[in-house]
Swiss-Prot record:
Keyword field: Disulfide bond, Glycoprotein, Hydrolase, Lysosome, Phosphoprotein, Protease, Signal, Thiol protease, Zymogen
Residues bearing attached sugar chains per UniProt: 226, 252
Residue spans of biased composition, Low complexity class: 294-359, 386-409
Descriptive protein name: Cysteine proteinase 7
Location of this chain's protein in the cell: Lysosome
Stored CDD domains: Peptidase_C1A
Length: 460
């Protein structure tokens, strides 16, 4: 994880620099990103992915220079277009405009803060992979929390998303093509339970038949309640009682490339909802994704995906690529970065050679500076090498370390009211798999438009 942290610091600082990047800088950033995320491209695919990466890097640069509380970066989705991202990881938008949009008459203390991760009610971040089964992860997350609370805060058990994908089709869900959390709750209620993750593991694809086994049931639901549509105060009341399933608009490029801070996207829709997630708390003022026991542990499955393939995340590794021409370079120096949310420094070195379209050999040494996001200080070192030929092979490795701290004990500081939302894209996305979404901001992204919280049967 140390190498990835160091590389991420470098990539974010390059991406936030207020200057036009050279082709060499783009290529260096892409090479480092490929090594960190262990990407493998065919010769036919490489140039297309590189151009998409450059466009995403430009978008990140432009966004971050505006000083938003939302910080973007070159995360696990940096090599796919927004169209690919929506088609692969999101469901078909559900039109919730017909839902009654009224404010709840419940009175709620807006100063209160809740984080169910600190109560042991949230399982580690999971990864849906290239399957549009987000609804199943939202459902299991809410059910896991409900069962844990019904059992007196004892025995948190990870539940099977594959059980829901394979077996709830008759209720209206469509596996990897999408579904609704309420329909999944109905299935669990009528089915008298859902199996454990360990007994019915996730495959990231539609199963050919339902393999539910009542002997492996680890949770049962008695009912569920819907949040008053559009009411964030009612959503807060429900989240105070336990983790709550919510549907949101996650279609924007800013959501795709989110890395930290409070997510605030005015272009978000409150009625066109395409992603199921889990609200596990809310807060105000300085907040973070936090590190609360198991909730921040490595998830089941891989953290790194690209269009058409999946690979596992690691701190060092190698990959292949193909281009025409050749290019070699070596670089050493230091990188500094500062911003309203993050201040610190990165130092390190890298060297290598890679194939490239320019056919020119370039060597450079020096230091660079940029701006970034976060709070604290960090230092790290890294080295990497890439070699390639016209036939299209390349290998690379990276090693290094980084360290950092800030006033919040090493976490990203933010300001404002926010929802703590658990996603299902692995720990390489967002803040260790979480996103902080703006709260009390006109139901932005539809956070309270279509939300539900289940109630579990005790003593399971």
């Amino acid at each position: 994880m140390k190498v990835l942290s160091a590389l991420c610091v470098l990539l974010v600082s390059v991406a936030t620099a207020k200057q036009q990047l050279s082709e060499v800088e783009y290529r260096n950033a892409f090479t480092n990103w490929m090594i960190a995320h262990q990407r493998h491209y065919s010769s036919e695919e490489f140039n297309g992915r590189y151009n998409i990466f450059k466009a995403n890097m430009d978008y990140v640069n432009e966004w971050n220079t505006k000083g938003s509380e939302t910080v973007l970066g070159l995360n696990v989705f940096a090599d796919i277009s927004n169209e690919e991202y929506r088609a692969t990881y999101l469901g078909t938008p559900f039109d919730a405009s017909s839902l009654e949009m009224t404010e709840s008459d419940k009175i709620f203390d807006a100063s209160a803060q809740v984080d169910w991760r600190t109560q042991g009610a949230v399982t580690p971040i999971k990864n849906q992979g290239q399957c549009g089964g987000c609804w199943s992860f939202s459902t299991t997350g809410a059910t896991e929390g409900a069962q844990y609370l019904a059992n007196g805060k004892k025995n948190l058990v990870s539940l099977s998303e594959q059980n829901l994908i394979d077996c709830s089709g008759s209720y209206g869900n469509n596996g990897c093509e999408g579904g609704l959390m309420t329909l999944a709750f109905e299935y669990i209620i009528n089915n008298k339970g859902i199996d454990t993750e360990s007994s019915y593991p996730y495959t990231a694809e539609d199963g050919k038949k339902c393999k539910f086994n009542p002997k492996n049931v680890a949770a049962q639901l008695s009912s569920y309640v819907n949040v008053t549509s559009g009411s964030e105060s009612d959503l807060a009341a429900k989240v105070t009682q336990g983790p709550t399933s919510v549907a949101i608009d996650a279609s924007n490029q800013s959501f795709q490339l989110y890395v930290s801070g409070i997510y605030n996207e005015p272009a978000c829709s409150s009625t066109q909802l395409d992603h199921g997630v889990l609200a596990v708390g809310f807060g105000t003022g300085s907040g973070s994704s936090g590190s609360h026991g198991g909730s921040q542990s490595q998830s089941a499955g891989s953290d790194s995906q690209s269009a058409g393939s999946e690979s596992s995340q690691s701190e060092s590794g190698s990959q292949s690529q193909s281009e025409s021409g050749s290019q070699s370079q070596s670089q050493s120096g230091s990188q500094s970065f500062s911003g309203s949310l993050y201040s610190g420094s990165y130092s390190g070195s890298q060297s290598g050679s890679q194939s490239g379209n320019s056919g020119a050999a370039v060597k450079q040494t020096g230091a660079g500076s940029g701006s970034g996001s976060g709070s604290g200080s960090g230092s790290g070192s890294g080295s990497g090498s890439v070699s390639g030929s016209a036939s299209g092979s390349a290998s690379g490795s990276a090693s290094g370390s980084s360290s950092g701290s800030n006033s919040n004990g090493g976490v990203y500081p933010t300001a404002g009211d926010y929802w703590i939302v658990k996603n299902s894209w692995g720990t390489s996305w967002g803040m260790d798999g979480y996103i902080l979404m703006t709260k009390g901001n006109n139901n932005q992204c539809g956070i309270a438009t279509m939300a539900s919280r289940p109630t579990a049967v005790a003593s399971l």
